[in-house]
Amino acid sequence: MDVGTMGSRAELLAISIQFGGLWVFRDLLQMNPLFEQDHVFCTFNHPNMGLVLISFAKVDGHILAAYALSKLGPDTFSICYPFSSKLDAFAQTLDLEWQIASMHKEAAACVYEFLCVESVCLHTGENWRESVIEPEYASYIFDTINVFQSSSLTRELYSLGEPNGVREFVVDAIFDIKVDNSWWEDPSNSYWKTVIGSREMFEDSRKKTSSPSPSFASSKDAGTIPAIQKKKSLLIEMMETESTYVERLRHLVNDYALPLRDLAKSSKKLLGLYELNTLFPPCLNKLIQLNSAFLDEFEAIMSDLNFEDIDEKKFEEIDLRLACCFESHFFAFSQHYPRYLEQSNDFGNVLKMASKIPKFVEFHDQVKLNANMNVGLSQLIMEPVQRIPRYSLFLDQIILLTQEGECQHTYVRSVEIIKNIAEMPTVDAEERSRIFAGLQHIIPDLAPNMISNSRNFIDCIDVTREFLKNGQLHLIPYTLILFNDRICLVQRRSKSSIASTILDLRKQNPRNSYSKEKRAQYIGSNMNEAVELTRSMVEENTIFLISKYASSPSFFNEYPILKFRCDFENVRTMDRFYQSFQKALSMNKSQPSCLSFSKLNDFVVFFNNYSRFEYEKESKRSDIVCICTNDANVDKHKFLQDGNIVITFFQQDEDFHLSFDSWLGVSLPTEAVIAKEDLREACLNYLINIKRLLLCPFSNRNFSSLDLYSNLIQHLLSANSSPRKSRLSFGGRPGSPSKISLSLNRFYNQGGLSKSCATLPSQMYNLDHNNISQKSLKFNTHNTSKASAEKTVEHLEAFKGGFKYHTDLKNLLYPLSEKEKIEGDELYDNILKETFNEELLSHYPPNIIYATFQKYLSSFINRKFGVLLSSSFIQQLNTVENLNLSFNSTDAVYHLKKILQDLPESSLKILENIFSIASDLLLRLPLKDQCDFVTKQLAIALAPSMFGSNAVELVYYLAYHSDRIFGTVEELPTPVSPANSNNDKQLDESKFQAIAMKEMPERHPKEILPGQIEREAYEDLRRKYHLTLARLAQMTRLNEDSKKSIPLLYDRFNHDLKLIKQSVQASLIRKQCELDTAKWTLEEYESKLNAKEGCQTNIFI
């Protein structure tokens, strides 16, 4: 599958019914303002799914459009309005007494459809036990439905249902080896580097100070055996002191920090929580984790070193590995050590105060005695502060003993990082204190826990929130403040900007006081990992802040989806804020060895690059994972988790093979092949489209964390004071959403599948599409009278004659005037009164006939017979492998004819007449746009709206090949042997001539007077002339389409030919090797034979 196809598919999924549902309602509202007035809601509380909300409304007076929202995700579907009669038949058959009003009956129909995986079908008589829902379950559901109307809830849903877009996001990239400097300099990784981009953007995260970069020159003895021995001793000493350092840090946490925290929570507390947080900063545990990982790798590399025999070449390899190890781990240190070093300035005051507490002194002495380490608390808490300069001392000596080259340069970069760490706290402390002091003046009620030495200010932006209150829309000014770990929301006192004031705090000292216009009220904050920050796909200046979990802080729990607007003048500022947010998420990972970014058009993709070993230890994983490997047997399934998509790039020969894996019920290509030169663009396009797919607010993912939907529904209903009552106990049939919700914890490590978009594993081997369609036909055949079907066929044949009466159809699609609309209504009424015939149509122009024909299809036929091209019919087509309707292929006609035989005879006859009319219209319409418009309207009338372009393609194919499709089923063509081909051809020609002679009417020469032509002959000639022009137009269109499709086929053919050529070349090489081996064996055999004959001759002589 090519990238363009993937892009269109992903964009379609991102706004399709299953993933963005409410766009259907918004479009319907624009077409029909009465839609909002008829909008009704119903709720019930399911024991497994929790609270379920369903909204529905009538469309065109005969179709119910419904949208359901539950923990399983969103679902949108349409129901033919006579569905209520099915409910009555079901209730009568099962002796269920339902006292349901009209509105409740419609709600029951929507709930019934929602609880069934397949399209609802009912059975009467003895087979009622095969019904898709159990009688007791249905009875309890329909008895507990609560129906109500709410215009404010309708508007709230419309505002939330909009799909979202993203231009910046984070991806985890996994490689076979560590992504260090040697990896970046390896030319064999050039194609991977084009994908993950540049790492220069993150150099500012190391926060270079004003001090010059260190420069070193190797000593004269560098590289000699004495220098190598001395260097080994330094490395051993450094490793031993690192082990002691890690042991002391663990002693500090286990024997001091944890016991004192436990005592602080009881009545025996020795120090308060504030003092404990000062002495034992939150980043202390992170330092232990980082240094333990550094020590493990340090020891692993040193274990390969032979201390007795000095192999200079092997030592150089180990030395380079050590240098790269130091650089990568010291870079990780630079993210966390500065916070500890900065807070160390307050250690002395707290220890001085604690030394005056006798019980604390007693506790300290007892711990020091039990530990038998002879190290006090004051020394332990200063260990990280003293350790950083010691790294620098060790490395200074190691660099002098290292020869100039890549290894020495890597050591120099490591020293540079360490010295920057030592100088960071002074710079950070001044800026941080200035910013937080200013924030406390601007936001007087700022939460105390927001001020922390481990928190860095990153960016802020002024926005406006749309808020619905008492049915009126209010605009409230807000400001979003972004820190490295949290996002803060404040409400401004006025419309004046405060973002510029906050940003200026980085460079200038805060004022003692600010005016009222420059102040704000603190609303709340949330963790960056707990929210999604995305932009609208429709309005460029709209921001969505979506809370992922119901355990969010109170404000974000009450409003899980916040919609903000930004001034168009600040769109660039908004882009910068998006990038800052994604960069903060990327920098907050614990294990990546390298950070990089790549741009494509307006999109920025941040890559966290790992080795496989590093990623197994990563706790904060992204929802998109790329595995870049040369190993065809890589175990990609261990990287799968709930809610993510894994893309594997496997390099083979001159191409890259892509495969996609996910537990989500989304449609993804199974495999793709990309040439090396197209790798970057293709890869980034795949990532962008997949991220769009995942970022819809109502995307059905994270099924093990089902808080968002419950949180959202509770908010929507409680905000409008909607009454709720329900009781439900039975579990429903095996395929119902209740069973799906139960099975969420049984499959795929608590991963699940959505009702709309996937099939349960337990059902994968029990699908029989033909059986489903046949079951649904039993009800249709039972309830649809044969007489009404025959009458409908007569009406359609009359329409066909009416269209043929008019020779010029260029005005067919002209809009109707008011007078013509009245005439069209009268014509439609005559159809319903059964006073309709072909002669009646001859008095109307083509545009009135066509408008009446469309109304007849969408209103009368749909109400009488339902959707003729049902969802099960289209799904059956989708299950046929290699079925391509874009070409006039015999197998496509065969499969279509075979599946059509499952339809009822009446429906088949109706479809045959409809597509006969469509075929005639498409052949006679002069313009391609007119043909496309007619095809789309037929697709809307005959197929469910959820299938979109697929339904249009199907209708187009059925119309142009109606004469071949609507007939008896033909077997697929079988290969014919050359011996019989000529005989079969002669038989076919003779048979065709016999049939033609038999069907040819007798023609008697008719005398025609000179200069006179009969009107019938003239009309027949005129009709044939226009028919010929239409066929020429059709052939022109097919020629244009072939010009587009043939290059794709040509490229695919060249690719296949290339593979065949490679295979043939490989086969020739193997055969040549076999031939050479045979020749060599023969020569050896002949030489032995000659030697043997020579021996015998000598013996004889």
From Swiss-Prot:
The name this protein goes by in its record: Rho guanine nucleotide exchange factor gef2
SUPFAM superfamilies linked to this entry: DBL homology domain (DH-domain)
Q: Which InterPro entries match?
A: DBL_dom_sf (IPR035899), DH_dom (IPR000219), FYVE_RhoGEF_PH (IPR051092), GDS_CDC24_CS (IPR001331), Gef2/Nod1_dom (IPR032634)
**Domain named DH: residues:** 230-428
Q: Give this protein's Gene Ontology molecular function annotations.
A: guanyl-nucleotide exchange factor activity
Q: Name one Pfam family in it.
A: RhoGEF
Look up the domain of life of the source: Eukaryota
General function of this protein: Has a role in the control of cell polarity and cytokinesis. Involved in bipolar growth and septum formation.
Q: SMART domains under this entry?
A: RhoGEF (SM00325)
Magnesium among keywords? no
A GO CC term?
A: medial cortical node
Q: Where in the cell is it found?
A: Cytoplasm, Cytoskeleton, Microtubule organizing center, Spindle pole body
UniProt cross-references to Gene3D superfamilies, sorted A to Z? Dbl homology (DH) domain
Asked whether the UniProt record includes Metal-binding among its keywords, one would answer: no
GN (gene name) = gef2
Keywords (A to Z) from UniProt:
Cell cycle, Cell division, Cytoplasm, Cytoskeleton, Guanine-nucleotide releasing factor, Phosphoprotein, Septation
Stretches of Low complexity bias are at 210-219
Protein's GO biological process: division septum assembly; intracellular signal transduction; mitotic cytokinesis, division site positioning
Chain residue ranges for the region called Disordered: 203-222
